[in-house]
A protein has these predicted regions:
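Terminal peptide-recognition signature
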Residues: 6, 41, 131, 164, ...
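Glycine-rich beta-strand-centered segment in the early N-terminal region that forms part
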Residues: 28-46, 54-97
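Conserved "cap/hinge" positions at secondary-structure junctions
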Residues: 79-81, 95, 151, 175, ...
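Short glycine-centered segments of the SAM/dcSAM-binding site in methyltransferase folds
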Residues: 90, 146, 170, 236-238
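Mid-domain Rossmann-like dinucleotide-binding core that forms the NAD(H)/NADP(H) cofactor-binding site
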Residues: 125-198
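Glycine-rich cofactor phosphate-binding loops and adjacent beta1-alpha1 units
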Residues: 187-188, 192-242
């Protein structure tokens, strides 16, 4: 392959994101300079933060039309002009949505090949680290605590619930729709669920957490956060994510 296929941001969305906001382009294959590594992108992480980057500067510079869509990936080293990296090495890198990228070695994080490669972007990646440290360091759950998590069927929320179960907690997941709620209980072992789309949020929450809430992991804010705050026990902890 002599060209680099890219998915670029064609225009900045003002409302709902759609295919019309992206464009497929081809660019010359990047050539790594001294201290850089040429990468072949294997898997790209699609995250909720991607949408926020289109709205303006956050913890990273704002995206502009015509740029390669930003995003992290698991990539394989193709060629290296940097010590410590060799062809075949697996890395996490902020490559963007493209087939290849040449990046400074200092921006790469080596990865160990273990299990499905997709786990390096999820369980061992940003979602997993967010869930693990957000729950255990901020939420500080104890065995027997009631832990409630919103957006429970999402990448972070689903991991929060599973970690809380390992800690011996009663876990309540808040999600939208019967299918998501059923998945949380049958596949992930949540003790109770709240379907915010079904109405009567406060009543559902009271039934799911009759002893109150000791830890609330908030992924959404708004009305759901407010409802959970009114159910918090004395000394309860709230971890705000996002």
């Amino acid at each position: 392959m002599t060209t680099n296929r890219q998915i670029q941001l064609a225009s900045l969305p003002s409302g709902k994101l759609g295919p019309e906001h992206f464009q497929l382009a081809e660019a010359p294959m990047p050539v790594p300079a001294d201290g850089e590594v040429l990468l072949k992108v294997l898997l790209i992480s699609l995250d909720a933060a991607n949408r926020a980057w289109m709205q303006g500067a956050t913890y990273r510079a704002a995206l502009a039309a015509g740029q390669v869509m930003a995003g992290g990936s698991i990539s394989e080293v193709v060629a290296s002009n940097a010590p410590g990296f060799a062809p075949g090495d697996l890395v996490f890198a902020d490559t963007g949505w493209q087939t290849h990228a040449a990046l400074p070695a200092k921006l790469l994080t080596k990865q160990t090949r273990r299990g499905p490669l997709s786990h390096l972007l999820s369980v061992y990646g940003i979602a997993g680290l967010t869930a693990y440290f957000g729950l255990l360091q901020v939420g500080r759950p104890k065995a027997g605590d009631t832990v409630v998590v919103s957006a429970a069927a999402g990448s972070v929320g689903s991991l929060v619930g599973q970690i809380a179960k390992i800690q011996g907690c009663r876990v309540v997941g808040i999600a939208g729709g019967a299918a998501k709620c059923a998945w949380l209980q049958t596949e992930l072992g949540f003790d109770a669920v709240v379907d915010y789309k079904a109405g009567n949020l406060n009543g559902q929450l009271k039934a799911a957490a009759p002893a109150g809430i000791d830890v609330y992991f908030d992924n959404v804010g708004g009305d759901i956060l407010e409802a959970c705050l009114f159910r918090m026990n004395l000394g309860g902890r709230v971890a705000c994510c996002g």
